[in-house]
């Protein structure tokens, strides 16, 4: 691995949308295997370090869950005191990832992410750029508008945007060079408008800013399987991830 990569997992959500009562990263898939274990298996071979951002109430349980990896130095943990959104979680943890060349951001509920996608993203990434795996979706929840090497816009259903059938959606993975990244986030915050529904300054609209204003070229890694975009937001999503794992057909196998 020519570049030093730090994977960062924002996992400070409370799991309220799913009604689980625990952070989604700690939900059991089967036989003691949690979402965390699946993510770690996929990320560790392609990253030098994994950093996880948790909520105050999630810190102790997660440290227990990942005790072995933390003790080995392969994993570190920080706390997002207030749920201000993914951007706040990622950049609040900047001291942990800034020593590395590249940050590989992965949402903490992406149980269906394949090892092949992680490998291809890291291989395609260039330090100064922005690399995002995208997949066409029949009914996307988030849609990316791309023009050549530029990311024009990210539409978000959660903020009232209309996403078009067949549009490109992410799989919860974003690869960015760390040099100057926190400075660009600070600049972005000066004029960034809060989401019309959530009231949060979201991370996803920061990506078109990086592409168009900061001049970071976009590399799209095509993904064929739309199931990789399926996080765990509902009981149906959780059932899907569990059934795929038990069949041995979750992306990349066990």
Annotate each language-model stretch with its function.
Residues 1-9, 33-106, 110-118, 123:
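Conserved N-terminal catalytic core of the sugar/cofactor nucleotidyltransferase
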Residues 3, 167-254:
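Conserved alpha/beta core of the MobA/IspD/sugar-nucleotide pyrophosphorylase nucleotidyltransferase superfamily
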Residues 3-30:
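Glycine-rich N-terminal loop/short-helix segment of MobA-like nucleotidyltransferase
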Residues 18, 61-66, 121, 185, ...:
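Hydrophobic packing residues within well-ordered alpha-helices of enzyme cores
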Residues 25, 74-76, 150-153, 217-219:
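Conserved beta-strand segments of alpha/beta enzyme cores
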Residues 48-51, 129, 227-228:
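Short active-site oxyanion
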Residues 51, 103, 110, 143, ...:
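A residue-level structural signature of the nucleotidyltransferase/glycosyltransferase Rossmann-like core
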Residues 113-196, 211-214:
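Conserved core of the sugar-phosphate nucleotidyltransferase
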